[in-house]
Amino acid sequence: MPLIKIDPASTHTKYKQVVHGIERALSEKRLRLNDKLPSINKVALANGLSRDTVLQAYDELKKRGLIYSILGKGYFVKSLGFHHEQHLFLLFDELNSFKEMIYNGFLEEIKEKAELDIYFHHFNPQVFQKLISESAGKYSKYIIMPSNLPRTHESIAKLPKEDVFILDQTNAYLSHFPSVHQAFAKDMKRGLTEVQSRLKFYRKLYLIYPGNKEPIGMVEGFQEFCAEIKFPSEVIHSVEENHIQKGAVFVIPNDDHLVEVIEIAKRNNLEIGKHIGIISYNDIPLKKVIENGITTISTDFYQMGKTMGRMVLSGKKQRLENPSRIVLRQSL
């Protein structure tokens, strides 16, 4: 029995019939791991097809992780698991409690409908570039966290444009891709505006912004808010003892700095929420109880993952801002 048999009366397109033929051969064990497939030219000539039709079929099988190609040698069987229609490439910056929420939300939507491979670039531009280059052409969809890395659009340009989705952070170079992202400048300004009445009890507002991982939009929203209401403010890159004084309020994106500010305040007998104020970024259950509650600005990470999962499965491409809110607690 031939691997591929084209039925002119079939309701399936010819390239899909090629795909189904390979799937049948895998399920019937007529093809095994690392077996060589017939060449594109051979399949085309034997079935009266164009090379483009066969290439389209083989490309889909590659994206689903069923076959792989070696330049100059041909196509070979990579996997016998053909039950998933989609093989997804998911690139995160790092794994922390917030990103785990995104991942769990994404999995909740995807369930068993697709095969998923997850990678991490750890904010390293070279690792990002390498992972993108090595994945090109091997997956049906690419869900990518570019974070604040420079020139990510150059690496992403190697991927099929119609298969790319951007997650969490986007930028002007990536604005043409569908995304579920945070609007950092808008969220910062809106959050501070909502607690403006509390800020009148303090003298100066600080944003602790190291600039390594944090989005620049945080700075933009912070500075715009402070300029509009003429509130004394400063963007600092690290915490010094002399910053922690009565009347200071700190916006803290990084939890390491949150611990540092609290420790310095305790050493100097400063009460959180009375002598100094704290607004932390990204809510977790622990922040409900630390120092009787830490005020937070946070997006819904789990919902972000679910929204992206729905978008990938539905094929409905949009650019969506994930909602953010400020949770007022005793630290302000």
Can you name each region flagged by the protein language model?
Residues 1-45, 319:
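Extreme N-terminal segment that seeds HTH/winged-HTH DNA-binding domains in transcriptional regulators
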Residues 32-69:
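N-terminal helix-turn-helix
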Residues 40, 64, 75-133, 139:
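Amphipathic helical "hinge" segments at domain boundaries
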Residues 89-90, 138-147, 205-210, 246-254, ...:
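Periplasmic-binding protein-like
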Residues 148-186, 282-292:
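Flexible loop/hinge segments that line or gate small-molecule binding clefts
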Residues 170-206, 258, 297-317:
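Hydrophobic alpha-helical segments within soluble ligand-binding/sensing domains
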Residues 190-229, 320-332:
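An alpha-beta-alpha
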Residues 246, 256-332:
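Flexible loop/turn connectors
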